[in-house]
Structure formats: structure tokens, C-alpha cells
């Protein structure tokens, strides 16, 4: 038994699955997901410009 032959006999990569035909519901769902993704990115960009939200929590003081 040589070192080349040892180990798994299966290939490391699985063969790619055939892409199925998408019906109208799938197309509409994908489109809605893309729109939601764009909306979330816009909200994140707008929120990242501001400072911390609700800064009136418990304030930690230094050593007492």
C-alpha cells in the first residue's frame, strides 16, 4: 500500500447539481430578497453615520 492510495476514495469536491428551472414564484421571491437586501444596506449606511443610540444607560464611574 503506497502513500498515494491511502485515505478516502471519494473526490474532495462533490459534483455540481443541475440548476433547476425557476418558476414565477421563485423569481418573485429572489427579486424581493434583493430589494430587502438593498433596503437593509441603505439603513445600515444611514445608521452608521450616527453615534451610539440611547446613551442614557447605567453609567460606569471610575474607582470609588
From Swiss-Prot:
Coiled-coil features, chain-numbered ranges: 21-50
Gene name linked to the record: tma7
Organismal lineage: Eukaryota, Metazoa, Chordata, Craniata, Vertebrata
Biased composition (Basic and acidic residues): 27-44
Domain of life, per lineage: Eukaryota
Family in the record: Belongs to the TMA7 family.
Signal sequence coordinates: none
InterPro entries cross-referenced by the UniProt entry: TMA7
Protein name: Translation machinery-associated protein 7
Stretch list, region Disordered: 1-64
Keywords assigned: Coiled coil
Keyword Coiled coil: yes
Species this protein is from: Tetraodon nigroviridis (Spotted green pufferfish)
